[in-house]
Amino acid sequence: MATHSNRGRAALVALTLTLLATGAAAPARARDGDSSTVEVRRGTNLAVSLSPDGSTLLMDLQGVLWKLPATGGEGERVTGDLDDPALPSWAPDGERVTLQSYRDGTYDVWTMRPDGGDKRQVTAGPYDDREPVYSPDGTRIAFSSDRGGSYDVWVLELASGRLQRWTDSAAEESQPTWSPDGTEIAFVVGRAPDDPDRAIGELTRLTSRTIEASDERGARRVVVTESAGTIASPSWGPEGDEIAYVVTAPNRSVLKLSGREVTRDEDVFPFRPQWRSATELVYAADGQIRRRDLAGGGAAEIPFSVRLDVTRPAYEQKDRAEDDRRPRPVRGIVSPVLSPDGEQVAFVALGDLWELRIDAAPRQITHDRAVESDPAWSPDGRRLAYSSDREGSSNLYIRDVRSGATRRVTSAPGAEVAAAFSPDGRTLAYQDEQDATFALDLATGESRPLVPAAWEPGAPTWGPGGETVAVAALRPYSNRFREGTSQILAVDAASGEQSWVAPIPFASLSNRVTSGPVWSPDGRAMAFVIASRLWVMDVDAEGRPTGPPRRLTDEVAESPSWGRGSRELLYQSNGRLRIVPAAGGAPRTVPVDLSWRPARAPGRQVIHAGALWDGVRRQLRHDVDIVLRGERIVRVHRHRGGEHGPDVVDASDLTVIPGLWDNHVHQELYRSFLGARQGAQQLAFGVTTTVGVGDPAYQALEDREALAAGRRVGPRFLASGEPVDGSRVYYDFMRPASDQAELERELGRIGALDYDILKTYVRLPYAFQAQAIDFGHRRGLPSFSHYWYPPVAFGQDGISHITATQRLGFSRTQSPGGFAYEDVIRTASASKMAMMSTLFSATTLLADHPELLEDPRVRVLYTPSQLEELQQLAEDARGSEAAAARVGLERSVGILREILRSGGTVLAGTDLPLEPIGVHLHLNLRAMVRYGFTPFEALQTATRIPARQFGASGDLGTVRPGRLADLAFVEGDPLARIEDAANVRMVMTNGRLRTVPSLLAPFADG
């Protein structure tokens, strides 16, 4: 067996073992909240495993294993909420069961008794081991693993612990099943097409249409080939002549037997069919367990019932002090960089660029509406490079520090960001919107490629002599699952030759945004952040380590930069700037005397509205006055006339509605590309509040402060920092927490930086997720993730998608056919855990609304790349896959509708900026109405309901006295015609009115 030091996971293992010792099947309870149980008789993507004697079933439903008679009955829980088990398989003697479990922070193979007792971990380490199955003689377990650089089939000999690799190819081989005589293993083969344009770290979609079999010597043969769809979960029959499996396709799944269809019009779940005999299968479909006679006798239901624990969270949400006008210290300091002489710091805050002389007051360098980013000093400290969209798109500028003279050095229609001077100061490295890295010759203005496009790489840093460039880049473990570790990629600037550097084996940089690497000016060392602490490592001119990494801090650290030659490092720690000697020693704080004050609205205003939807009633009120004092509404009454003057807003031909919420945004993801346009795009479509569910923290804080201070135009922003992830990551801003100490540092950082929302991500184990939820609630922060159960038992506040990326590779909230069953609907109703709409396929409605592509708000405010993407989406909406996408959209909306009408919580959201900004929120609302919501119900998911969900119902979401004046002014009646909600003509945020023409004007000339 491969071995690996697990010191990093010791705390998590100790926690789970303690829980197991006190009762393995006990659910993890939330600290606070109203706990109850819900009985369910239908499950979403449930799986079953039949005992060898045919008497007992183990059912995997919502991440819990349940034992029940094979004839049906009440399920007995045999695993706990923190076990995170899946895909159980019986030993041939029926005495033990093997399964995959994530409770150690990676997928490992475990065994246990069928009643859940005597759990034993049989594989361990940094790799994922999945889909275990006993050999027919019970002496071995086959499983799939990424320990070889791609998924292969491995076999564990239980007596000796010896591991043997049965497959070894570049393909992804998984989901093994033994032949009845134990001489062969069949498995699914996933192949990725060659893609020369694939970015570094980016996956290519697998095609899994083949089942092959291999013997112990590696002799392989093709067993089954399908012409379409995706094969899942083969199961070799008892006589060796048949293999059962499931084929999935958009909105459809079917059980097949060696090429022929066994089911029709069933929502078959994609798990291993169970052979009751050579002529009978047990499987799960349509929320049920079924027994099917293969001789043509049809299928019979095996009834079951289980009780799921749910918790409705009860805590006081954070007070956002909307009426507090006192000065507040700036927390959002972005990209601080120390000057070469160590005397100054350049940074971005409150929407502008600043310079700070150590122990002096900051000095504002820019004073404009543009978004500045990524300051970088020249090696001699006389010039400062940065990005700004002051002339329409984000380009590179260089400022002479002494004179203040500034010149633009790039002018491409796209964005150029992340500047870094070469050691001789003659070249700027930078990155474009496609995440490729270039070198700009400052004398000639010519650019040349340095590093090919990578998946969300870090900023470039130069090695000595400008011969090597390094970036942080993602290195996935396989092509089957997208996650990997953020490592250092060093690239020869002349030849393009690439080499990977992992400073600590299997450890990830703390993100690819603020964790380095940063090469020292003398070229002898790199600084970087791992486990949220600052490290330095000696390297050669190519970036190869010449010594072990040295930890410089025990406190949280990020955004390192070098100064005083290579003798000091500046970094950020929980809102403070700190400087530490590169040789080690005590850090010192750099004071930043900078504050901001919330912007004030005009004194008294009267809005004469032709019609009003207040967010509560099911019909409009007509001819209404809305009276404001400052930011708040003081009266709403029938229009009285006689009001004239500059404090009167004439909306007599418009309908006033509460400003819309987009409850799923990553607002900083493309901010440096989109610049000031992004806020205007949102406001122009009536969005007055956005809810961040994952962003680089300091960028999010800067944005929140700049917006609240009136220094940037855009919606009110509930900000979150980076999601807390597990030992593997995907997006550049995810922060891994692979042990208890790392988790505690991350949670401490969240508390220090004053988040509004807490997000956990795909690879964080449930033991850590439960701690994060509890931590957030004790600080008034709602918690969101991609996972439904057991987080619904932990008191989690919501999920950001109906279904999205899962570490399992499948969803427990939506089936292959696009349905959710009683387990999801009833727990949603009982817990009130919110589900965000995030209807990606709503873009298929662009085929019905071509006018959106010609809307002036789109034509003027979108960048060329945004317009190109929108046009491609519109073409796809008329393409060959559009019909299937609409079926999937209808079924997804059906889930949301059923949750809402059963008393659950639905929030409208878009996953901005991954979908067309502004436009996509309205496509979500239109999709809801098209497939069964009333306009009133749809609008409430973007107004009153989110205000209640995020503790703001006393301030936002309705048009009532005492509420803040966040309003949209639209033509038409959106309660009768949901499309009218997009006919925005004016918008008001915090009592400040803007017309759509005023939002377009700064960008009218491109």
Regions found by a protein language model. Give the residues of each.
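Histidine-rich, glycine-flanked metal-binding segment
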Residues: 69-75, 618-657
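Divalent-metal coordination cores built from histidine and acidic residues
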Residues: 651, 655-656, 660-663, 674-798, ...
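Active-site neighborhoods of metal-dependent hydrolases
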Residues: 746-764, 810-931, 997, 1004-1006
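C-terminal cap of metal-dependent C-N hydrolases
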Residues: 280, 562, 948, 964-1005
